[in-house]
């Protein structure tokens, strides 16, 4: 090859126009495949999804238990010395003569409850009380818009993204049925909420030394239609504000819930000034089914997109798991059982509450009328008392003959 000769370049088999057409066709094909298989693809069955979520939750719970057991073996209760020093402090001589603190064993003995042989309870009476409470809550919600206002404020909070328009609640149904609690049993658990195992013999003294407590577990079953429907708009603010608007409507319904509710109490700690707390959570074997309906678009609408239903359901399950499914739990501080002045109601406090609950001018008038009525009633009672005493008081010239005496005539 001579130095001044140029290599021969191969001629392209497709022209620029043909390449552009092939590229456009491939993009359209990819978009169509994405819409068909990703958005409108058939979702997995509810049984498969529920079993997959249950296995994930179970593996997470087992990993948490293993980490707790490994921490126990590595750390030999570093806070035991501090707890012992708190117990050895000098207590008040006034309360020293009282009964000793009840342990798990003494509580079970005094209530005639045997953990190994006691049969689970049906809780029929508790279901009636819960049903009455829920029925009253539903009746109050129908005559008051407070729950609707609270939901609207919560949905349109400060953390709403800029691409989302105002969210409006279009439907709210609190259902018609009631949850059924059953199969209640008492389970001794340790300080971390782990049971002692079905194959191990329960030792109340050892459980008390290890900081154990008693936990009530009951099955919960609810089959109902609790619905919340929303409407909003997706805003496209690029390249300029409100370039496009896409209306979106979503309705989420809870159709079934079944699981195991665990309730226990954490006693107060006087050294840290912590109140007594009620702790509750759900075990990882729960089942929560939703019915999700969606409507996207204004003219050509897409109804009940499966992928939207999957995303919303997955987000709701994650929200529930992160709050009240083991190993996570919810704490509710309980008020003190001893009577206090600040918790007393009635008398002048009732009048003051009425005055505070109304406007300043109207509340003052109502409070003034109430005080006037109270004074009138008090004066009427005092007048009636004086009249009864006056009629009973003998006059000066009255003489009452003694038994056996003779009447003397003037």
From Swiss-Prot:
It is found in: Endoplasmic reticulum membrane. InterPro entries: Mmm1, MMM1_dom, SMP_LBD. This is Maintenance of mitochondrial morphology protein 1. The lineage of its organism: Eukaryota, Fungi, Dikarya, Ascomycota, Pezizomycotina. HAMAP family: Mmm1 (MF_03103). Disulfide bonds: none annotated. Residues 1-19 are lumenal. GO terms for biological process: aminophospholipid transport; mitochondrial genome maintenance; mitochondrial outer membrane translocase complex assembly; mitochondrion organization; mitochondrion-endoplasmic reticulum membrane tethering; protein insertion into mitochondrial outer membrane; telomere maintenance. The chain crosses the membrane at residues 20-40. Homodimer. Component of the ER-mitochondria encounter structure (ERMES) or MDM complex, composed of MMM1, MDM10, MDM12 and MDM34. A MMM1 homodimer associates with one molecule of MDM12 on each side in a pairwise head-to-tail manner, and the SMP-LTD domains of MMM1 and MDM12 generate a continuous hydrophobic tunnel for phospholipid trafficking. GO terms for molecular function: lipid binding; lipid transfer activity. It comes from Pyricularia oryzae (strain 70-15 / ATCC MYA-4617 / FGSC 8958). Pfam families: MMM1. The keyword Ribonucleoprotein does not apply. The SMP-LTD domain is a barrel-like domain that can bind various types of glycerophospholipids in its interior and mediate their transfer between two adjacent bilayers. Component of the ERMES/MDM complex, which serves as a molecular tether to connect the endoplasmic reticulum (ER) and mitochondria. Components of this complex are involved in the control of mitochondrial shape and protein biogenesis, and function in nonvesicular lipid trafficking between the ER and mitochondria. The MDM12-MMM1 subcomplex functions in the major beta-barrel assembly pathway that is responsible for biogenesis of all outer membrane beta-barrel proteins, and acts in a late step after the SAM complex. Coiled coil: none annotated. Residues 71-98, 380-410 are annotated as: Disordered. Residues 41-410 are cytoplasmic. It comes from the Eukaryota. Residues 387-398 have a biased composition (Basic and acidic residues).
């Amino acid at each position: 090859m001579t130095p001044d000769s140029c290599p021969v370049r191969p001629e392209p088999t497709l022209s620029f126009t043909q390449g552009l057409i092939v590229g456009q066709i491939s993009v359209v094909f990819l978009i169509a495949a994405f819409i068909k298989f990703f958005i409108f693809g058939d979702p997995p069955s509810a049984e498969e999804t529920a079993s997959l979520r249950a296995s994930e939750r179970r593996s997470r719970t087992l990993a948490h238990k293993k980490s707790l057991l490994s921490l126990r073996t590595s750390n030999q209760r570093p806070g035991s010395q501090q707890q012992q020093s708190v117990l050895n402090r000098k207590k008040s001589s006034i309360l020293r003569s009282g009964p000793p603190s009840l342990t798990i064993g003494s509580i079970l003995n005094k209530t005639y409850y045997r953990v190994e042989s006691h049969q689970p309870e049906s809780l029929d009476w508790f279901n009636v009380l819960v049903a009455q409470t829920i029925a009253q809550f539903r009746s109050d919600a129908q005559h008051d818009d407070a729950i609707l206002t609270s939901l609207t404020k919560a949905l349109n909070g400060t953390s709403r993204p800029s691409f989302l328009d105002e969210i409006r609640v279009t439907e709210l149904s609190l259902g018609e049925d009631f949850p059924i609690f059953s199969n209640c049993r008492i389970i001794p658990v340790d300080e971390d909420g782990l049971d002692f195992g079905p194959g191990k013999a329960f030792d109340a003294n050892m459980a008390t030394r290890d900081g154990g407590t008693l936990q009530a577990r009951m099955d919960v079953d609810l089959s109902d239609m609790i619905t919340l429907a929303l409407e909003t708009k997706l805003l496209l603010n690029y390249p300029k504000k409100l370039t496009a608007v896409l209306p979106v409507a979503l309705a989420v319904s809870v159709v079934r819930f079944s699981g195991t509710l665990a309730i226990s109490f954490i006693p107060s700690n006087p050294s840290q000034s912590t109140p007594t707390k009620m702790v509750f959570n759900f075990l990882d074997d729960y089942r929560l089914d939703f019915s999700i309906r969606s409507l996207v678009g204004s003219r050509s609408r897409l109804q009940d997109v499966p992928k939207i239903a999957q995303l919303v359901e997955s987000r709701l399950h994650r929200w529930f798991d992160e709050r009240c499914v083991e190993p996570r739990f919810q704490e509710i501080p309980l008020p003190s059982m001893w009577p206090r002045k600040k918790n007393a109601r009635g008398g002048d406090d009732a009048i003051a509450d009425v005055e505070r609950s109304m406007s300043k001018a109207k509340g003052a008038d109502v409070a003034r009328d109430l005080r006037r009525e109270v004074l009138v009633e008090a004066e009427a009672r005092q007048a009636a008392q004086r009249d009864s005493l006056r009629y009973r008081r003998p006059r000066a010239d009255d003489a009452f003959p003694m038994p056996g005496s003779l009447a003397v005539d003037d």
